[in-house]
Amino acid sequence: MIQVEENEHIQTLVYQLNKEGKSICGDSFFMKADDKELICAVADGLGSGSLANESSAAIKDLVENYASEDVESIIERCNQAMKNKRGATASILKINFEQRQFTYCSVGNVRFILHSPSGESFYPLPISGYLSGKPQKYKTHTATYEKGSKFIIHTDGLNVPDIRSHLKKGQSVEEISNSLKMYTTSRKDDLTYILGQLS
């Protein structure tokens, strides 16, 4: 499944594949952009199939319902919602177009990389663990971005040796997605990524 959206501030592309043999994807995502900001989230439910989807879909719904709150408040809501569920790893990204600023928070192995036209990359080390309803520490990153910056948020179903080179070379989100196709064929795990290019 591929979903493409754009406005004057951003172009985005979402790509998702189920694990081979599974009818339900254990990953979920949410993305919404208006003329002021983007909020997006990717969640990877532990395991695969319907129980994994139950956890990741709960995170997607919470991000959608509480999108106006700050990133750390949203991720804490997501953590609390994982009580009596299998649990999930998750990343949440908010981008303020007017201030050219982004805020990012994650727990677990959903990765985020932002590459700037000047050659700098922002690649926060993930906090180990997963959202489970138990007390959890979070690390929130806030930084500014350059016009033309490109980013990807992806679950561990996408395993690319040097993903920054794809962000660097690709002229558009579609071109970057095409360059990643060769890494989406194994289907050993659910796979989800969100690509973005900031104007």
Curated annotation (Swiss-Prot):
Its EC number is 3.1.3.3. Pfam families: SpoIIE (PF07228). Negative regulator of sigma-B activity. Dephosphorylates RsbS. Plays a role both in maintaining low sigma-B activity during growth and in reestablishing prestress sigma-B activity after induction. Could have a negative feedback role by indirectly communicating sigma-B protein levels. It catalyses: O-phospho-L-serine + H2O = L-serine + phosphate; O-phospho-D-serine + H2O = D-serine + phosphate. Coiled coil: none annotated. This is Phosphoserine phosphatase RsbX. The keyword Hydrolase applies. The gene is rsbX. The keyword Hydrolase applies. It comes from Bacillus subtilis (strain 168). Keywords: Hydrolase, Protein phosphatase. One of its GO terms (molecular function) is phosphoprotein phosphatase activity. GO terms for biological process: response to heat. Residues 11-198 form the PPM-type phosphatase domain. Gene3D superfamilies: PPM-type phosphatase domain.
